[in-house]
Amino acid sequence: MLDLVEVNQQITKMATEDHLIADDMAERLALAVERLHLESARWQAFVDKLAMSKTSWLVATINEPPNRTYSLPRRPEMVTVVAADGSQIMPSHHEVVPAFLLNIATVVLHYGNGGGAAFASTPSLFYRDEDLYLDYGGERVQVTGDLLGLRRTLMEFGSLIEQAVAARNGGDAVCALSDGSLILWQLEGRPPDYQESMLTDYLACLEQSNRQGIPIIGYISRPRSRDVVNALRVGLCPEEAPNYDHCPYERDERPPCAQIEGLTDRRLFASLLKAGERSQVFGSTSRILDRYGAHRIGFFYLHVGSEIVRIELPQWASTNAALLDLVHAVAYDQAQKGMGYPVALAEAHQQAVVRGAERDLFYDMVTAVFRQRGAVMAVSPKNLRKRRMTV
């Protein structure tokens, strides 16, 4: 039971500190905007400095003046938007059997020529030993947490591409929308055999999308990334070739690069972009992308009216002017139709989500079926207590 008086005191303290942080961030933002325009005026020298620098941060790669903006292109009258999302019932040793369920939903929205929509969700139950465990760096480990999340991501992508390819056969332009990053950063630091297994299937989806001319959009709402700000931090360093393993300013109270530390790209581009406009396409230096080949992921920031979002897309789409314009126009249009968030993704989420009551019903069904077959099944006292709490 919460002590609301104590909580209120802590909230008041938090709000006071947040106000002070906001004032500090405003100063950092002003400096970052100034630096952005300065480096844009000499952007080729800036690119050279970034190439010579060595940092421990993700630093955006730049191909043109970083303050360049692009106006909203016209969306094709005939276009199909496909989205996928998923949710899961996690495995639990407190339940009657070790099993997990993945529910993958797809949404297909046709615009123009009468429109139309198709919604589907497909539950998949995993219970065999080969489902619940995998070989991971020479060990056999249980599929749970991030490992389960990655499996779900691959299933979402497979369903997304399958539906997008089917829609492409109609002849209209097609965009495939995914909620979140296209960069599988979760694979960094994982065993090589596991990386290879996950990337093989993932990149096969991207390759199929490429062959069909279907751009995949990774839509990130309220992004916390700092790739572009980190590039500006390198620009603030007086050194010609900054090496942050041997920084001559690390003992300073406030090193030059720390002047805009903590600022997000979202705040930076909120001061630059107008509604409908996007930034240039930046490159990511995430190490896992070295394994992506022709599908290396780039990103741009887009002002959708209510917020700045990060849009990720494969290199083959970002270097194709027609596909890049299609991604720009569709991402913005979807956000408008969804009152700030893509309507296709919102619908896919609604189709995919497994609610608490459904989870309990799922395990009740499992228990009932096993008991019908004469099995002796038992939920742990802990879980039984949670389900039927009394005082």
Question: What are these regions, as identified by a protein language model?
Answer:
Residues M1-T69, P73-R74, G145-V174, G180-V391:
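Long, contiguous domain-sized segments
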Residues V81-A84:
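Short hydrophobic beta-strand that contains or immediately precedes a catalytic carboxylate
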Residues G86, S178:
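Short, glycine/charge-rich beta-strand/loop segments that flank catalytic centers
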Residues I89-E139:
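Acidic, metal-ligating active-site segments
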